[in-house]
C-alpha cells in the first residue's frame, strides 16, 4: 500500500472512483423511475411506516426538497437515530461534506472540498466556540445520540448568520413539545481498539453510555428533554514526524560538522540548487485515555398559541491524558552528505549526524464547553411573528505538559567511551519514489535500546497553555406574512461579542548537569524495562525503527527536580499571549416570494445583509535578556516590565442574496442562487503577539539565530475573505426514497493571503535590534473556484423480496481552484516599503482544506429487525494550515475510510448495535513544505463498538 505514488496513483484511483460514481448514478436513475408505478397514489405510499436508516434518508430528502436555499441534511424524527458514533462522522455522510480525522475520529468539516475556514457552524442557530483557536466547531464535543438534525446550507440567504463562503452547518437538538411523546432511552456501548491492545498493560477496552428523557406536562404546554453521556475510551497513536520548520539548504555548498547553508531570500532568483530539510525527525509512541461527560437539556413552554419559549443548554467536559515516548533526531540539518534530491528539492536520500534523544512527556488536556440560549417567539397576530434570542457559548481548554530530554554523549552513563567517541550518531535517510514512509537507519553500532547511551544534558520543561473562547450574542427577528407577489417580509438585527484569549507559558528550561554518578543512579532507577508498545509502526512499510530506550517521566522529574510536577508559572504574561475581541453588528431584510411563472410555480427569497465588524487585539511587549544554559548555549527570557500594544481593525460588508426555485415538473426542481459571502479569519490569527521559537527543541548559540526565529503569532489587520457566488441545481424526486440531483457552483474570491515583512525593534540584552517580522496580509489577488456536485439515492424496492430492503446513496464533488497561499518562509513575499513582491522558491498552496475530489458512498440493507450499513469516504489531498497562521505550508495526503454499522432489534424497544470505524487502518500522511516531501505518517488503527439500546 505504501509503495504507491501518492500523487499519480491516487489521482488515477480518483478518476476511477468518479467514473464509478457516474456509472452508479446511471444505474440508479432507471431504478428510481421503476419505483413509482402508475396509479400509486400518495395515500398508498403514506400508509407504509418506515424507521431506521431508510427513515433518516427519507427525512433528509424531504428537508432538501422543502428548503428554499440549496440544502443537504441528515435528520431523524427520533432522538438517538442519527446513524453515527459522533456528529462529525454523521456529517461526512451528507452530500459534499468530508472530514479531517484526528485520533481516528472525524473532527474538522470541509464543504464542497473547501476547508473549515470557509465554513460556518452553528448550534441551534447560534455561533459556537471551540478550544482550537479557529472558528470550526469541535464536533467531537457533541454526542450524535443527543442530536436529531443536521443541515448544511450550500447557498446563503440574508437571514442566516454570516460567515460561510462554502456553506453553513447547522446542528439542532429536538424541542420536547414538537417531539410530542414521552421517551426514555438508554444505550451502552463497549469499545475495542486493536492498537490499544498493543499497549503494554492495556486491553484496548473502553465504553460509552447515554441516557435521555423527553416528556410533556400541563396539557402539553410544558416539555422537557435531557440527555447525558459518559465516554471513557482510549485513542493510542503511533507516528513519525518531522518538525514544523523547514529550510532550503544550498546544495552547491557542502558543510561538515555544522548545519547546512540556508538558501537566503536575498539569493532567491539566482538559480542555486537546493533541497528541503526539517530541523528534526521524531518517532513517537502515544498511550492515551479519553474521558468525556456531556449533558444536553431543553425546556419548551407554550402557554398559548401566541407564545413559544425555548431554553436549551449544552455542557461538555472532556479530559484526555497522553503518555508520549519520543526518539528524537534533533539536528536534521547537520553534517549532511550524499544528498540525493529531485527537481523540486524533495530529498530522496542523505546521510547525516545528529545527537539522538530519548524524550518523554506527560500531557493532559481538559476542555470544557458550555453553551445555550433563550428564544422567545411571539405571534401578536396571524401575520406577524417576533422572535428574540439570546445566547452564550464558552470553551476553555487547558493543557499541561511535563517534558524531559536525555541526550547522547561521547561516553555512556558509566563513563565508557562509545565506539563513536562523539555525541552525534551517523544515520541515513531514504524514501522510495512515490512512498510517504521514509526509512531512517541509525548506525547499527548504536543500540537504540541501550539505556546507558541516553543520559547527558538532562533538560526539564513544564508547559501550560490555556485558550478561552467566549461568544455572547443576541438577535431580534420579525416576520410578516403578506398577500401578493411577496408572501413574507423578514427583517432582523444581530449583535455579538467574541473574545479569544490564550497564553502558553513555560516553567523551564532546566538544563541539569549533575555529577555523572548521580546521572548513573537516576538512569538505572528510572528506566522502563520494556518498550511501552508491541509492534510499533509495524503497518508502515519501510519503517526500520520499532523500539528504543524509554524512561519514566515522573521518576526523572522526582529524582532530578525534587518534585514530579514543579507547577506552572504564576505570572502568565508573555509577548506570545493573544487577547482578541471581535464585535459584530449585523442587520438584514429579506422577502420571500411564491408565484406562478406561466405554468411553472416559482418560490424563493431575495434579501441583503449588512455586517460591521470591529476587532481589537492586544499584545504584550517586553525587553529580552540572555540566560546562559551552562552548556555553551543560551535562551531568551522576558523581563518583568511589559507594555501593551493595541491594534484595531474595522470592516463593513454588504451581502446581497437571491434564491429561486422553479418547479419545472411535479417531481423536478430547478434551483438558482446568487449571493455574496464572507469568511472571517480565525480568532487566533488575529493575535498581536510575538514569539521566539525553538522548533527543534535546542537552544540559541548566537544572537543572530535568536533574531531569525522571531515571528508574529497573528495579523490583527486581516479582513474577511469575500466571494461572489452563483449556484444552479436540478433535482428529481421520483419517490420518498429517491433523489437524483446535480449542482454547478462558481465562487469569485476578492483577495487572498500573502506573507508580508515588517521591520520591528526589540531590546535584547540591552541592545536595540531591528528584526524582520513576517505576518500575513490581504492581497489584492483575484481567484476563483468552480465545481460540480452530484447526488443519487434510492431504495431498490423493485427487486424481489428479500432484496427489496437494499438501498444506496452516493455523492461526489469536484472542485477546481486557482487560489494561492504562499509559504511564509520560502514563498512569495510582499515588501510594504517598496510595494513589490519578491518571488519565492517553492510553489504556493491553494485554499486551506481544498480537495479537488470528494466521494461518499453508502449501501444499506433493512429488512425486519436487521439493519446494515457500509460507508465509504474518499478525499483527495489538501492543504491544511496550522491554527494561528503565519506558518509554513502543510499538505494532507488523500484519505480513504470504510466504516460499517449494524443493528438487530431483539424485541420491542430493545436493539443490539455494532459499529466499526476505519476498518482498513488507513493512515494519515502529511507533507511539508511542498506536496511529496514527507513530513508525517500517523496510524491510529480501527475502532469497534458493540452495544445495546433500550427505549420506553
Task: Identify the meaning behind each predicted range.
Residues 160, 176-183, 218-222, 306, ...:
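Short loop/turn motifs that connect adjacent beta-strands in outer-membrane beta-barrel proteins
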Residues 744-879:
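Gram-negative outer-membrane beta-barrel transporters
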Amino acid at each position: 500500500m505504501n509503495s504507491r505514488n501518492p500523487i499519480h496513483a491516487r489521482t488515477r484511483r480518483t478518476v476511477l472512483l468518479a467514473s464509478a460514481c457516474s456509472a452508479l448514478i446511471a444505474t440508479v436513475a432507471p431504478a428510481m423511475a421503476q419505483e413509482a408505478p402508475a396509479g400509486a397514489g400518495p395515500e398508498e405510499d403514506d400508509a407504509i411506516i418506515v424507521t431506521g436508516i431508510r427513515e433518516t434518508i427519507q427525512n433528509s430528502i424531504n428537508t432538501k426538497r422543502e428548503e428554499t436555499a440549496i440544502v443537504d441534511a441528515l435528520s431523524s424524527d427520533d432522538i438517538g437515530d442519527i446513524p453515527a458514533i459522533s456528529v462529525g462522522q454523521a456529517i461526512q455522510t451528507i452530500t459534499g461534506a468530508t472530514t479531517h480525522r484526528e485520533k481516528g475520529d472525524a473532527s474538522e468539516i470541509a464543504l464542497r472540498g473547501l476547508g473549515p475556514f470557509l465554513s460556518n457552524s452553528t448550534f441551534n442557530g447560534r455561533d459556537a466556540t471551540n478550544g482550537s483557536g479557529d472558528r470550526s466547531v469541535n464536533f467531537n464535543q457533541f454526542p450524535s445520540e443527543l442530536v436529531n438534525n443536521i443541515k448544511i446550507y450550500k447557498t446563503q440567504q440574508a437571514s442566516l448568520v454570516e460567515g460561510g463562503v462554502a456553506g453553513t452547518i447547522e446542528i439542532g437538538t429536538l424541542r420536547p413539545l414538537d417531539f410530542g411523546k414521552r421517551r426514555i432511552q438508554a444505550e451502552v456501548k463497549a469499545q475495542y481498539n486493536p492498537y490499544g491492545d498493543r499497549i503494554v498493560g492495556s486491553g484496548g477496552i473502553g465504553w460509552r453510555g447515554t441516557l435521555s428523557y423527553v416528556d410533556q406536562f400541563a396539557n402539553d404546554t410544558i416539555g422537557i428533554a435531557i440527555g447525558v453521556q459518559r465516554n471513557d475510551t482510549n485513542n493510542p497513536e503511533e507516528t513519525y514526524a518531522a518538525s514544523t520548520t523547514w529550510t532550503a539548504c544550498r546544495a552547491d555548498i557542502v558543510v561538515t560538522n555544522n548545519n547546512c547553508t540556508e538558501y537566503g531570500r536575498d539569493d532567491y532568483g539566482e538559480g542555486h540548487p537546493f533541497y528541503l530539510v526539517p530541523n528534526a525527525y521524531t518517532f513517537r509512541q502515544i498511550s492515551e485515555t479519553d474521558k468525556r461527560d456531556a449533558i444536553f437539556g431543553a425546556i419548551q413552554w407554550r402557554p398559548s398559541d401566541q407564545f413559544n419559549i425555548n431554553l436549551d443548554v449544552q455542557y461538555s467536559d472532556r479530559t484526555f491524558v497522553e503518555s508520549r515516548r519520543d526518539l528524537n533526531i534533533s539536528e536534521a540539518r547537520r553534517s549532511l552528505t550524499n544528498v540525493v534530491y529531485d527537481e523540486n528539492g524533495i530529498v530522496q536520500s542523505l546521510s547525516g549526524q545528529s545527537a539522538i534523544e530519548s524524550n518523554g512527556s506527560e500531557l493532559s488536556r481538559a476542555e470544557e464547553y458550555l453553551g445555550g440560549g433563550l428564544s422567545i417567539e411571539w405571534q401578536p397576530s396571524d401575520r406577524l411573528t417576533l422572535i428574540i434570542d439570546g445566547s452564550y457559548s464558552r470553551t476553555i481548554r487547558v493543557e499541561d505538559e511535563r517534558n524531559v530530554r536525555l541526550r547522547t554523549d561521547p561516553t555512556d552513563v558509566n563513563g565508557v567511551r562509545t565506539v563513536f567517541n562523539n555525541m552525534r550518531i551517523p544515520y541515513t535517510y531514504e524514501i522510495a519514489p512515490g512512498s510517504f514512509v521514509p526509512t531512517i537507519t541509525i548506525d547499527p553500532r548504536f543500540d537504540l535500546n541501550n539505556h546507558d547511551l541516553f543520559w547527558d544534558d538532562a533538560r526539564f520543561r513544564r508547559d501550560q497553555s490555556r485558550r478561552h473562547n467566549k461568544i455572547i450574542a443576541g438577535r431580534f427577528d420579525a416576520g410578516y406574512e403578506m398577500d401578493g407577489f411577496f408572501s413574507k417580509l423578514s427583517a432582523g438585527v444581530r449583535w455579538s461579542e467574541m473574545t479569544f484569549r490564550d497564553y502558553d507559558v513555560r516553567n523551564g528550561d532546566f538544563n541539569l548537569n549533575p555529577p555523572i554518578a548521580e546521572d548513573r543512579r537516576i538512569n538505572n532507577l528510572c528506566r522502563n524495562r520494556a518498550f511501552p508498545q508491541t509492534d510499533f509502526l509495524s503497518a508502515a512499510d519501510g519503517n526500520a525503527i520499532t523500539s528504543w530506550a524509554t524512561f519514566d517521566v515522573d521518576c526523572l522529574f522526582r529524582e532530578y527536580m525534587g518534585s514530579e510536577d514543579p507547577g506552572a508559572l504564576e505570572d502568565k504574561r508573555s509577548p506570545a499571549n493573544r487577547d482578541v475581541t471581535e464585535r459584530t453588528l449585523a442587520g438584514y431584510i429579506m422577502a420571500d416570494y411564491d408565484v406562478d411563472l406561466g405554468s411553472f410555480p416559482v418560490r424563493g427569497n431575495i434579501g441583503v445583509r449588512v455586517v460591521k465588524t470591529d476587532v481589537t487585539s492586544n499584545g504584550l511587549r517586553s525587553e529580552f535578556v540572555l540566560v546562559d544554559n551552562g552548556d555553551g548555549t543560551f535562551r531568551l527570557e522576558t523581563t518583568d516590565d511589559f507594555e501593551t500594544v493595541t491594534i484595531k481593525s474595522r470592516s463593513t460588508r454588504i451581502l446581497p442574496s437571491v434564491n429561486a426555485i422553479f418547479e419545472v415538473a411535479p417531481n423536478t426542481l430547478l434551483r438558482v442562487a446568487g449571493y455574496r459571502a464572507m469568511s472571517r479569519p480565525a480568532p487566533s490569527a488575529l493575535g498581536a503577539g510575538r514569539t521566539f521559537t525553538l522548533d527543534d527543541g535546542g537552544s540559541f548559540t548566537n544572537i543572530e539565530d535568536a533574531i531569525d526565529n522571531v515571528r508574529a503569532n497573528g495579523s490583527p489587520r486581516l479582513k474577511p475573505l469575500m466571494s461572489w457566488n452563483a449556484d444552479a441545481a436540478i433535482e428529481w424526486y421520483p419517490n420518498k426514497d429517491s433523489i437524483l440531483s446535480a449542482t454547478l457552483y462558481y465562487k469569485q474570491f476578492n483577495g487572498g493571503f500573502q506573507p508580508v515583512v515588517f521591520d520591528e525593534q526589540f531590546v535584547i540584552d540591552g541592545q536595540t535590534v531591528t528584526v524582520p517580522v513576517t505576518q500575513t496580509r490581504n492581497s489584492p489577488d483575484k481567484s476563483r473556484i468552480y465545481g460540480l456536485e452530484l447526488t443519487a439515492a434510492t431504495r431498490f424496492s423493485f427487486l424481489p423480496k428479500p432484496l427489496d430492503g437494499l438501498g444506496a446513496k452516493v455523492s461526489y464533488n469536484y472542485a477546481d481552484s486557482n487560489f494561492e497561499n504562499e509559504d511564509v518562509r520560502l514563498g512569495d513575499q510582499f515588501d510594504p516599503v517598496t510595494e513589490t513582491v519578491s518571488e519565492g522558491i517553492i510553489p504556493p498552496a491553494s485554499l486551506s482544506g481544498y480537495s479537488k475530489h470528494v466521494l461518499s458512498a453508502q449501501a444499506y440493507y433493512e429488512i425486519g429487525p436487521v439493519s446494515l450499513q457500509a460507508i465509504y469516504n474518499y478525499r483527495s489531498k489538501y492543504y491544511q494550515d496550522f491554527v494561528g497562521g503565519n506558518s509554513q505550508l502543510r499538505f494532507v495526503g488523500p484519505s480513504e475510510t470504510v466504516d460499517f454499522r449494524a443493528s438487530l432489534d431483539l424485541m420491542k424497544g430493545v436493539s443490539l448495535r455494532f459499529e466499526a470505524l476505519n476498518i482498513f487502518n488507513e493512515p494519515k500522511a502529511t507533507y511539508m513544505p511542498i506536496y511529496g516531501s514527507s513530513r508525517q505518517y500517523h496510524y491510529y488503527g480501527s475502532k469497534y463498538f458493540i452495544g445495546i439500546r433500550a427505549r420506553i
